[in-house]
């Protein structure tokens, strides 16, 4: 008779969870950050608020963002004027959009990842879907399963309303799923559309304006599995360890509340200061087993909550400017796409490494770190091991 121990050993993979493919997608509507204040104050009928507009212009100028992509077009907003007011009941209109559009955008990214992976989608055993908005039953995970034509027996996990740290969370979960289920191939999708947070400006709620200056829409998908099939699957990064922690004295630093008016966004404390003050502790805990203490010896993927967070982390850790180059590039080209950001950066790092002819997928380096920051304040830390690039 077979023992439980023997069953468990047979169920577990041999090697570490590995990223096997990455795909990204954005809505077609691209907005220029330099002209966005004019558009935003016009579409929200707020042009008379000249001082507030000047303040918003400064926020956009300091954001280090060149452009963003948004599902919301001028036509859609004109058809839904309640979304353009500051605090008008508008949740129904917002929900009607995102419950359809979030799975659709996720499908675009997932289709690209599956194509790169090169295996039949019937081999996908698990689906992890993450989005900040559009809570529904059955959820976006179910809708995506139908849109992609995945097997009805695919094992699904739906993550709603986690926020900006969740790009790290999905990797942590995918790692556990892949390593504890031999032969598992996990499709991870983060799809974010900021239609739930868009609203007109207010003098009394400047943190909402910060969100209007930073957030963009995008979806990213990755396929994770252990023990890649030689000559069939092409490993990109190994997921070595993953941790989550709540930062001390950070209650209420970032809050989001789903109300009749949509998702309201609140910044209550010095978020960049809290993150930069605590980040070295997370690094030390993650890299002590590897005997790594030189943070410039790593390749970096950090959620770009905003330029101030990146600047303070860079200063606190003494990072060379090129360490956060890929992170800053994604912020500049797409804005803050919440959970999808770090997966876009992961894609950028491996592409840039290949383009520049470097010897590994991680900018020529062996070890890397991926950070997610978000409400809580919650920090996700993922240790990555790059893969050698064969010519």
UniProtKB/Swiss-Prot annotation:
Keywords: Acyltransferase, Transferase. The keyword NAD does not apply. Its EC number is 2.3.1.74. InterPro entries: Chalcone/stilbene_synt_C (IPR012328), Chalcone/stilbene_synt_N (IPR001099), Chalcone/stilbene_synthase_AS (IPR018088), Polyketide_synthase_type-III (IPR011141), Thiolase-like (IPR016039). GO terms for biological process: flavonoid biosynthetic process; polyketide biosynthetic process. CDD domains: CHS_like. Pfam families: Chal_sti_synt_C, Chal_sti_synt_N. The keyword Transferase applies. The active site is at 164. Pathway: Secondary metabolite biosynthesis; flavonoid biosynthesis. It catalyses: (E)-4-coumaroyl-CoA + 3 malonyl-CoA + 3 H(+) = 2',4,4',6'-tetrahydroxychalcone + 3 CO2 + 4 CoA. Gene3D superfamilies: 3.40.47.10. Expressed in fruits. GO terms for molecular function: naringenin-chalcone synthase activity; protein homodimerization activity. Homodimer. Polyketide synthase producing naringenin chalcone. Can use p-coumaryl-CoA as substrate. Belongs to the thiolase-like superfamily. Chalcone/stilbene synthases family. This is Polyketide synthase 5. The gene is PKS5.
């Amino acid at each position: 008779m077979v023992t439980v121990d023997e069953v468990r050993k047979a169920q577990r993979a041999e090697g570490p969870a590995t990223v096997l493919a990455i795909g990204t997608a954005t809505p077609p509507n691209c907005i220029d950050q330099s002209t966005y204040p004019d558009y935003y104050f016009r579409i929200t009928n707020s042009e008379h608020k000249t001082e507030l507009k000047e303040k918003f212009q400064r926020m956009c100028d300091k954001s280090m963002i060149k452009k963003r992509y948004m599902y919301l077009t001028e036509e859609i907003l004109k058809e839904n004027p309640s979304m353009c007011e500051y605090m008008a009941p508008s949740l129904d209109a917002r929900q009607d959009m995102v419950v359809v559009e979030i799975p659709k955008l996720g499908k675009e990214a997932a289709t690209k990842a599956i194509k790169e992976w090169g295996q039949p989608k019937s081999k996908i055993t698990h689906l992890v879907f993450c989005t900040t908005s559009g809570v529904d039953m059955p959820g976006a995970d179910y809708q995506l399963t139908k849109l992609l034509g995945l097997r009805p027996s695919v094992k699904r996990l739906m993550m709603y309303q986690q926020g900006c740290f969740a790009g790290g969370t999905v990797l942590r979960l995918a790692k556990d799923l892949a390593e504890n289920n031999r032969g598992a191939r996990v499709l991870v999708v983060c799809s974010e559309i900021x239609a739930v947070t868009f609203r007109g400006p207010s003098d009394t709620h400047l943190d909402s304006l910060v969100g209007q200056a930073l957030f963009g829409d995008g979806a990213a998908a990755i396929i994770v599995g252990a023990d890649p099939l030689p000559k069939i699957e092409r490993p990109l990064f190994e997921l070595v360890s993953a941790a989550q922690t709540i930062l001390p004295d950070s209650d209420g630093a970032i809050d989001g509340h789903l109300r009749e008016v949509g998702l309201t966004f609140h910044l209550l404390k010095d978020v960049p200061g809290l993150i930069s003050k605590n980040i070295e502790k997370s690094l030390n805990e993650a890299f002590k087993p590897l005997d790594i203490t030189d943070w410039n010896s790593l390749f970096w993927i950090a959620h770009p909550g905003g330029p101030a967070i990146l600047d303070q982390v860079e200063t606190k850790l003494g990072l060379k400017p090129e360490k956060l180059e890929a992170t800053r590039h994604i912020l500049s080209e797409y804005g803050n796409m919440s959970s999808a950001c770090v997966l876009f950066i992961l894609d950028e790092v491996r592409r840039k490494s290949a383009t520049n002819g470097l010897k590994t997928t991680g900018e020529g380096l062996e070890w890397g770190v991926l950070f997610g920051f978000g409400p809580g304040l919650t920090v996700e830390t993922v240790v990555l091991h790059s893969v050698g690039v064969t010519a």
